[in-house]
């Protein structure tokens, strides 16, 4: 028994709809490829899923080539005597830019490793070479950036060395202008040698030295002495006192 005829209507089951889309899409892409090979025809196929995902096939070098050819053929069939309105020109520009944007988006997805199932071995090889060239450019740019940073650091190092040298020269000049009497000790303290004070002139002492009487001192009362002797001793004692006590105390 053969398969029954499939009714053409929207498949309500989501899973069945996705499975059917994948099978029919692959079959359609295969048919387009076979047509381009068997009949040597230029075939371009564009498919958008319900979620807006793009699937395409182009037997030419790029989809843009086929689209530009299609655009030229479509508008060349118009009567050349009829003036082209601004609206038509704007629409033509819109179609061209839209095709360009779609091509760039497709290339971007391929570079990111997406939607590679529709590419053949030749296109995959071209993509590999493109990625290798891009990687070499990135590495070269990174190396150049690191070399520039190294050169800047070396220049700053030279500037710091020059500034350090100038500060050292200023410090030596300042040290040369300091008096010889000022020096720095090993312990970081400051030692200053002061000039010796001039010798003081010899002055009279504040207190005069005591001058002792040659006669022996007498202590107590001697009964053998007479009145005249006591008077003599009193006078002698007064004289001795005058000799012992400074004049300013009398």
From Swiss-Prot:
Gene3D superfamilies: Transcription factor, MADS-box. InterPro entries: MADS-box/MEF2_TF, MEF2-like_N, TF_Kbox, TF_MADSbox, TF_MADSbox_sf. One of its GO terms (biological process) is positive regulation of transcription by RNA polymerase II. It is found in: Nucleus. Signal peptide: none annotated. It comes from the Eukaryota. One of its GO terms (cellular component) is nucleus. Residues 87-177 form the K-box domain. GO terms for molecular function: DNA-binding transcription factor activity, RNA polymerase II-specific; protein dimerization activity; RNA polymerase II cis-regulatory region sequence-specific DNA binding. SUPFAM superfamilies: SRF-like (SSF55455). Keywords: DNA-binding, Nucleus, Transcription, Transcription regulation. SMART domains: MADS (SM00432). Residues 1-61 form the MADS-box domain. Combining natural and engineered alleles of J2 and EJ2 provide a wide range of inflorescence complexity that allows breeding of higher yielding hybrids. MADS-box transcription factor that acts redundantly with EJ2 to control meristem maturation and inflorescence architecture. This is MADS-box protein J2. It comes from Solanum lycopersicum. The lineage of its organism: Eukaryota, Viridiplantae, Streptophyta, Embryophyta, Tracheophyta.
